[in-house]
Amino acid sequence: MAPSSSPEPVVDESHESSDSEVEQTELQSRAPKRRRLSESSTDSYVAPAPLPTLSRIKKKGADEENKPATSDKDEPVLIKDALEIGLNDAQNSFASLNVAPWLIGSLTTMAVRKPTAIQKACIPEILNGRDCIGGSRTGSGKTIAFSVPMLQKWAEDPFGIFGLVLTPTRELALQIYEQIKAISAPQSMKPLLITGGTDMRPQAVALAQRPHVVIATPGRLADHINTSGSDTIRGLKRVRMVVLDEADRLLAPGHGSMLPDVETCLSALPPSSERQTLLFTATLTPEVRALKSMPRPSTKPPIFVTEISTENNASIPPTLKQTYLKVPMTHREAFLHVLLSTEANASKPAIIFCNHTKTADLLERMLRRLSHRVTSLHSLLPQSERNANLARFRASAARLLVATDVASRGLDIPSVELVVNFDVPRNPDDYVHRVGRTARAGRKGESVTLVGQRDVSLVLAIEERVGRQMEEWSEEGVSVEGRVVRTGVLKEVGEAKREAAGEIEEGRDVLGRKRNKLKKVR
C-alpha cells in the first residue's frame, strides 16, 4: 500500500519577505497495523494424510516492515521548490498529454486525476495517429489508455461506427462498455455491447443503426457478419479505430483459438492502411510481438510499442503475498472451508478459481450450504445470471466468487483481497492472470494455492515463470489440518458436498428450485 499523505500548511517567515505563505506536503509513512490474533490456540497439528514437500529450500523468516524515521521539525518549502513541485505536478496530468478538457473533467468525476505509466506512454502517440502495441500488467489502466484517445478523436468527427473494441470474454466486454459509457457521459455518444448469451435480433437492429463505438466478443460479432446481412454490418466499413484488448488471448493459436473469429471481424473493417489499430495486453506473447515486424504502407508511421511492467518481465506485483497450502486430494473442500473461515480471512472478499465448470458449480452449492455468502461465474451460466452474479459480488452482496478462468482476465474488482487457487492452473500464465485479480493498483493482496500430491511440479513451473517462490501459508494460532480433523469439519463438508451433488443431478438451480430445462454442467 502506498504511504498516505496528509497536506499541512507551512508558513515560511523570512526577514526579506514577510507574510508570504506556501503549502508543504509531508509524506508520512505509517507501517500498516497488523490484526493481533490470540497468543495461544488450542488447535493442534494433525495431518490427515502424508503430504509431499516442495523440492526446494524454503525461505526462512517473514518480510520485515521498517517504519521510516520522521523529522521532528518540518523544513520550510522555498518558493523555487514550490514552483518546481507545481511544474512536476502539471507534467503528471492528463492536460500535459493533450487530453481534451471535457475528458479531463469526466475522468475527474470518476476520481481519475493522474495518468498511469501506460496512459502517459500511449495516449499522446494514439492521438498522433500511430498504431500501438501496449503491454502493462493487470490493473494499470489500459482501458483508459485506449478509450480516452478514441473518444477524443470521435468527438472531433462524430459518426458511427467510429471505433470497435474486441475482447475475449463477455464480462470484460461489459466492463469496458460501462467504462466507456461513463467516460463519454458529457457527450451524446452511443456505445453498443455485442456479446453472446443474448438474442441476436435486437443486437442486429442496434448495429444497423450505426452506434458510435461497438464493444464485442469476436464470436458473436463474427456471427453477425456471417448471418445478419450487409445492411447490418455496413457501418463497420467506416471504422477508424480498432482495439484488440487482451490481444495475447485473441491471437493465441491452438485448440479453442479465437483467431478465426478475429480474422472474420477484421475482414469487415477498412484495410489496415485506412484505420488505426491498437493492441493492449498484460502478456506480450510472440504472436503479439510478431505484428511489429509485419509489412506496413510507407505512408504510415512505425508502430509504437511500449512494455511497462508487463507480466513478462515483472509478473507479480510487489504488494502480492503468494502462498501455498498443502492439502490431501480427498479433503480439498474441507481445507478450503477452514481456510475461508479463519479469523484473518472470514471477512475478506475472495475469488476461488477452478479449472472446470463442473467443479465451480459444485463448490458454489457446497459453500452456500456451509453458510458462506457465495456466487459463481463460469461459461455455462446464462448471460443474465453471469451479469447478476458479478454485480452481486461487486456490490459485496456476496463475499466469495467461485469462478473458472473466464474471470481471470481484465476484470477490475478493487475490493478483492484474496485469491484462492482451488485447482492449480496447468498453464503458469493462467496463474499470473488469476492472482492479478488482487493487489491491483498498489493495494495489498494475497493468493493461496491448494497443493496436492500431484501438483508439486505445477507449482515449481509457476515459480520459475514468475521468478519468485511461494511461501507456505500460515496464520498465527491457526492449524488448518488440526481444525479439519478435530472439529467435525470433514463430516459437515462431506454432507454439504453430497447434497450439492444431488441437487445438480436433480436439475435444480443453486437455490434448490426445479428447472425443467436446466443446462447440465459437464
From Swiss-Prot:
Membrane-crossing residue ranges in chain numbering: none
Residue span(s) of domain Helicase C-terminal: 319-481
UniProt lineage: Eukaryota, Fungi, Dikarya, Ascomycota, Pezizomycotina
Residue ranges annotated as motif Q motif: 92-120
PANTHER family noted in UniProt: ATP-DEPENDENT RNA HELICASE, ATP-DEPENDENT RNA HELICASE RHLE-RELATED
Subcellular location: Nucleus, Nucleolus
Reactions it catalyzes: ATP + H2O = ADP + phosphate + H(+)
Family statement drawn from the similarity comment of this UniProt entry: Belongs to the DEAD box helicase family. DDX49/DBP8 subfamily.
Gene Ontology biological-process entries: rRNA processing
SMART domains in UniProt: DEXDc, HELICc
Organism, as annotated: Aspergillus niger (strain ATCC MYA-4892 / CBS 513.88 / FGSC A1513)
Composition skew (Basic and acidic residues), residue ranges: 60-75
Protein name (record): ATP-dependent RNA helicase dbp8
Written domain comment of the UniProt record: The Q motif is unique to and characteristic of the DEAD box family of RNA helicases and controls ATP binding and hydrolysis.
E.C. number(s) listed in UniProt: 3.6.4.13
Ranges for region Disordered: 1-75
Occurrences of domain Helicase ATP-binding (ranges): 123-302
Keywords attached to this entry: ATP-binding, Helicase, Hydrolase, Nucleotide-binding, Nucleus, Ribosome biogenesis, RNA-binding, rRNA processing
Pfam families with a match to the protein in the record: DEAD (PF00270), Helicase_C (PF00271)
